[in-house]
């Protein structure tokens, strides 16, 4: 790895939002490059113009930058092998197509989809793997010219040598062997003139000097075809590693139907970039550290040898765990705008509220809920809070409200006064007070929350609890 500059790439086809499966691919390739002082390349594979979306491309690049996955070569930053949009690289592909045809490695194919489907059916019926039967492989120059004169537009097929074997060392799966007789001649340019993925992807990796490619194992069977193309062209091939896919709870590849969400959706919910990165760095990859790490730390601990060949199930609870770690590790300066609480908090109190609730929130919506519970009118009581108030009884809250009305509205003074007047202590003291003052039986440490409320709110909420306890007690008699 130290003999040459490691260069990896992320080569998406942006037709929609960036989702977690593709993000993990980008992350693993970036970490491999960053960890070896190499270069991370972004290449946009946009040859399918019907599905290509400029908006999706801009969104994807914005997501990568927001996550801190900066590319050293690619769109908007340039590099030694431009352009970095495949649609603009057609002139490069044309030269290699001509080379393959001239050297006998490629030939025009005039077969219709109907003819190809009939051949596949016959092969399946005979218990053979479906592959191109070679119908056009032996056409003479005269036959090709006649078909063209008739207006037939051919695809271009790569001529796979028979009786051979393609071997390569996969960085994750180990040694791989594929019989060329099982591959069959494959299309490298469609009849409409557009370049095929297998061809452009392989050629661009070589021309851009990509040394290592980490991708999903759904691409494993593409690799022998791409190695054959590069060998025929005399171009260097990268080292490939194919990792198990991320699946949903149903075991199917992760998608919207089984729990996948886009990076943008998660960001709008308040997920922090380091939460996503720390989670994904551990999906199908063993990370020795259990601590929240920055990109440099993740890169230092990344090793393709520790990537699993088995599928990895998406675990939203694990993602939320890393979100909690990320929030707890963030500064007040960062959390304040992230929480979006300023409009809900009196001037001068925002940072105090951040400090009060930061240990118990994972998302901005939770922080805003606590801002309302502290500074707005009496909060709505959940069922557990109401039960705790009724259980403590009217006498307890009359004593608490009386103490507050006498000026004991800060937490320490209030609890000492209530304890002295009622003889109640411990959980039986704190739980009813929490329920009455916040509307919930769990949450942040009570002292800073109560001290932020102010005397009027404390009195109002304790009086409400006393009334509720009295009414419920009377009904139970």
Curated annotation (Swiss-Prot):
<comment type="similarity">
    <text>Belongs to the class-I aminoacyl-tRNA synthetase family. Glutamate--tRNA ligase type 1 subfamily.</text>
</comment>
<feature type="binding site">
    <location>
        <position position="256"/>
    </location>
    <ligand>
        <name>ATP</name>
    </ligand>
</feature>
<keyword id="KW-0067">ATP-binding</keyword>
<dbReference type="GO" id="GO:0004818">
    <property type="term" value="F:glutamate-tRNA ligase activity"/>
</dbReference>
<dbReference type="InterPro" id="IPR004527">
    <property type="entry name" value="Glu-tRNA-ligase_bac/mito"/>
</dbReference>
<dbReference type="Pfam" id="PF19269">
    <property type="entry name" value="Anticodon_2"/>
</dbReference>
<dbReference type="InterPro" id="IPR020058">
    <property type="entry name" value="Glu/Gln-tRNA-synth_Ib_cat-dom"/>
</dbReference>
<dbReference type="InterPro" id="IPR001412">
    <property type="entry name" value="aa-tRNA-synth_I_CS"/>
</dbReference>
<dbReference type="InterPro" id="IPR014729">
    <property type="entry name" value="Rossmann-like_a/b/a_fold"/>
</dbReference>
<dbReference type="GO" id="GO:0005829">
    <property type="term" value="C:cytosol"/>
</dbReference>
<dbReference type="GO" id="GO:0008270">
    <property type="term" value="F:zinc ion binding"/>
</dbReference>
<feature type="short sequence motif" description="'HIGH' region">
    <location>
        <begin position="12"/>
        <end position="22"/>
    </location>
</feature>
<dbReference type="InterPro" id="IPR033910">
    <property type="entry name" value="GluRS_core"/>
</dbReference>
<dbReference type="GO" id="GO:0005524">
    <property type="term" value="F:ATP binding"/>
</dbReference>
<keyword id="KW-0547">Nucleotide-binding</keyword>
<dbReference type="InterPro" id="IPR045462">
    <property type="entry name" value="aa-tRNA-synth_I_cd-bd"/>
</dbReference>
<dbReference type="Pfam" id="PF00749">
    <property type="entry name" value="tRNA-synt_1c"/>
</dbReference>
<protein>
    <recommendedName>
        <fullName>Glutamate--tRNA ligase 1</fullName>
        <ecNumber>6.1.1.17</ecNumber>
    </recommendedName>
</protein>
<dbReference type="InterPro" id="IPR008925">
    <property type="entry name" value="aa_tRNA-synth_I_cd-bd_sf"/>
</dbReference>
<dbReference type="GO" id="GO:0006424">
    <property type="term" value="P:glutamyl-tRNA aminoacylation"/>
</dbReference>
<keyword id="KW-0030">Aminoacyl-tRNA synthetase</keyword>
<dbReference type="InterPro" id="IPR000924">
    <property type="entry name" value="Glu/Gln-tRNA-synth"/>
</dbReference>
<comment type="function">
    <text>Catalyzes the attachment of glutamate to tRNA(Glu) in a two-step reaction: glutamate is first activated by ATP to form Glu-AMP and then transferred to the acceptor end of tRNA(Glu).</text>
</comment>
<dbReference type="InterPro" id="IPR020751">
    <property type="entry name" value="aa-tRNA-synth_I_codon-bd_sub2"/>
</dbReference>
<keyword id="KW-0436">Ligase</keyword>
<comment type="subunit">
    <text>Monomer.</text>
</comment>
<keyword id="KW-0648">Protein biosynthesis</keyword>
<keyword id="KW-0963">Cytoplasm</keyword>
<feature type="short sequence motif" description="'KMSKS' region">
    <location>
        <begin position="253"/>
        <end position="257"/>
    </location>
</feature>
<dbReference type="GO" id="GO:0000049">
    <property type="term" value="F:tRNA binding"/>
</dbReference>
<dbReference type="InterPro" id="IPR049940">
    <property type="entry name" value="GluQ/Sye"/>
</dbReference>
